[in-house]
Amino acid sequence: MMNNAPGSPRPGPAPTPGPGPEPHTPAVHAEHLTVVRGPRTVLRDLGFTIPRGRITGLLGPSGCGKSTLMRALVGTQAKVTGTLDVLGHPAGHPTLRTRIGYVTQAPSVYDDLTVRQNLDYFAAILDPGRTAAGRRDADVTRAITDVDLTTHADALAGNLSGGQRNRVSLAVALLGSPELLVLDEPTVGLDPVLRRDLWNLFHDIATGRGATLLVSSHVMDEAERCHRLLLMRDGELLADDTPDALRTRTGAATVEEAFLRLVDEATSAARTKETTR
């Protein structure tokens, strides 16, 4: 259920997935995950797990490797080494197509189609056949309602604001009720009320529908809304813990302060290593 930008190749119907992994297994498991792009190591020896049915925040400054990590998870990133298992399969496995919803930073919608037509199109790819028409219609209507675009359902996507187009992309990702949602900066360009409403939706999807969410952001106050956090800097993982545990570990009052203290610790350790060589 990957989001594809207009003009990119379209996948055919995904094969029927086999029996899923046991419920207690993590949604994502990574060991020694590394991505090298030219002379630069973009992700360096990452190891982490993402628990099922929870919201995990992927936080760090722009350019730290968050989007690269998300592309690796959904199987679209080249030159990935190490272990990366997603929903019990290697990342990019064909059976994951309809089990993952992916929202990129750039809205993946067709400007010359209405909101509903965009969703109808993607729903037909995910759930083809005439006999599925009623199910698709209900799925599309629910997704439009989820992202609060009911009053804009018949508006051309090209006439929407940037924030509204982002919400159309999110609605596409929600089609088919995926087990894992990978959302790259989904609240960028949204006003505080819509940000709050989307985070309420994310929690409903996790707790009410049992899905797993990985949500990236460079806005540290969004960290407080997550069950668990992956904090990144310069392609490395600084922390993999709960917000409460991070504050306790660093003696900080906020996650942002905790992040800055971890950055200072990492910088100091790197300098010490350089001077002892």
PLM regions with names:
Residues 79-96:
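Conserved ABC transporter NBD signature motif
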Residues 195-208:
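Helical segment within the ABC ATPase nucleotide-binding domain
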Residues 181-185:
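Catalytic Walker B motif of ABC-type/P-loop ATPase nucleotide-binding domains
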Residues 112, 156-160:
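Conserved ABC ATPase signature
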Residues 120, 124-127, 132-152:
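Conserved ABC ATPase "signature" region
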Residues 74:
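Helix-to-loop junction immediately C-terminal to a conserved catalytic motif
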